[in-house]
């Protein structure tokens, strides 16, 4: 018996149960896998299937396959596993049609289907994500959330800034967010994406699509991406697009990272938004001051650690009118007494991090005022985490952290473990420093 032929049959049982593999497609898919794994004929023996049908994720079967391939000396096993899960998954057009049909029947159900599919086909690696460290800090009026994400690599602000100017040798796909990643085989410095599935949509007349984040910072963490590879931008059109999105998918919030380094996200060279089901702490913030309240609109400033202007109305057009005015005023606003300078020459420093939500028939737009100025004392950003805190995190403070969920780098779990050992033992601290030199930053 060929071990791989048995594993193929197990994977087919899993796909029938969890990935909507149709009986008509079973023979076809079996032959694709036999060819992919260089196996001449299928397994004909008895097969225990009950435990496979009860699996919620494919990790057990993928571990079997990983070990079998390793024993045969196969290279690039992880890329091959993604390819196989892509073969077992429904085609992108089938997924799109089902998501849209379910959404039309019950808002949120289509996005639930896509989210669960992406867990079951291992695009979202739930077991790995469940290992992330999470804790919540309650305050008198609100709370903050903190997670150590063990999957996402740590980046420096200088590296993020280079994305806008760097030339790359391979230009397909142009970046990790491009729609051309759909089904892409991957390479040494670019992940395989055969198992990703997306939902196309239109925002303000432009072609966009929704996919889920493989890092899943929070429940149903989605990325909404422009079909065109164009730089991040914040403009009047941004506010309209965000509000149009929550009109189509009212169970989700959606927000945009700002378009400037330090106060933006880690990908500046492709326009995208982020959203999901999870209600982040900023949504629970109360008004600090109400500027305007009538039958059409309410405008207030929140009691929050960033300056957040919240605009609420039943009309998208009304919100956009006020949001445009806030944006236009903020990007030229100066107050040197608190180090706010909007421009240095032609270089703009001020921008907005906008977040939209729909509550019943009321639209809400939260506008976080941002400024990325630096000076001699704070070369990494006046309004960024200062140097004395970079041992915790030095990356830019993006949309999600500005909303109250702080995503810390994976090294912290390891480093804190060593520090705990140091504090609870009589071992020489210098021995730890010699073995783990990155502890010196603490």
Listing of model-derived features with the role each one plays in the protein:
Residues 237, 246-269, 275-334:
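Catalytic or ion-translocation cores adjacent to nucleophile or general acid/base/metal-coordination motifs
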Residues 1-224, 228-231, 303-306, 320-323, ...:
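Active-site microenvironments that recognize anionic phosphate/pyrophosphate groups
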Residues 195-198, 227-254:
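Helical scaffold of the NTase/Pol beta-like nucleotidyltransferase catalytic core
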């Amino acid at each position: 018996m060929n071990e791989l032929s048995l594993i193929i049959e197990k994977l087919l049982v899993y796909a029938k149960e969890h990935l909507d593999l149709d009986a008509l497609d079973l023979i076809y898919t079996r032959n694709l896998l036999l060819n992919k794994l260089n196996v001449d004929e299928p397994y004909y023996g008895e097969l225990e299937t009950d435990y496979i049908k009860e699996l919620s994720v494919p990790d057990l079967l993928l571990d079997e396959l990983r070990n079998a391939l390793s024993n045969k000396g196969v290279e690039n096993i992880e890329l091959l596993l993604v390819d196989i899960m892509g073969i077992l998954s429904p085609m992108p057009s089938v997924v799109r049609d089902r998501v849209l049909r379910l959404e039309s029947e019950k808002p949120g159900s289509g996005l639930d289907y896509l989210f669960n599919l992406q867990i079951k086909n291992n695009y979202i690696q739930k077991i790995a994500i469940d290992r992330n460290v999470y804790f919540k800090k309650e305050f008198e009026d609100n709370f903050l959330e903190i997670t150590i994400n063990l999957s996402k690599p740590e980046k420096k602000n200088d590296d993020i800034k280079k994305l806008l100017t760097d030339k790359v040798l391979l230009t397909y796909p142009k970046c990790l967010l491009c729609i051309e990643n759909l089904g892409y085989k991957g390479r040494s410095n670019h992940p395989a994406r055969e198992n990703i599935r997306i939902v196309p949509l239109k925002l303000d007349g432009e072609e966009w699509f929704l996919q889920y984040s493989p890092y899943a910072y929070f429940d149903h963490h989605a990325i909404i991406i422009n079909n065109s590879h164009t730089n991040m931008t914040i403009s009047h059109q941004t506010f309209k697009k965000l509000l149009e999105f929550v009109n189509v998918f009212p169970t989700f919030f959606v927000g945009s990272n700002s378009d400037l380094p330090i106060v933006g996200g880690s990908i500046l060279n492709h326009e995208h938004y982020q959203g999901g089901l999870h209600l982040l702490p900023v949504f629970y913030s109360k008004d600090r001051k109400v500027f305007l309240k009538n039958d059409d609109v309410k405008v207030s400033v929140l009691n929050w650690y960033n300056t957040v202007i919240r605009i609420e109305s039943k009309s998208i057009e009304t919100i956009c009118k006020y949001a445009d005015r806030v944006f236009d005023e903020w990007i030229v606003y100066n107050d040197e007494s608190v180090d706010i300078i909007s421009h240095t020459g032609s270089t703009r420093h001020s921008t907005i991090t906008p977040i939209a939500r729909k509550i019943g028939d009321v639209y809400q737009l939260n506008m976080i005022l941002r400024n990325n100025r630096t000076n001699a004392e704070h070369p990494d950003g006046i309004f960024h985490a200062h140097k004395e805190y970079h041992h915790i995190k030095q990356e830019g403070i993006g949309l999600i952290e500005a909303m109250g969920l702080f995503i810390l780098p994976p090294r912290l779990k390891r480093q804190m473990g060593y520090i705990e050992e140091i504090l609870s033992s009589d071992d020489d601290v210098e021995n730890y420093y010699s073995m783990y030199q990155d502890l010196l930053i603490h």
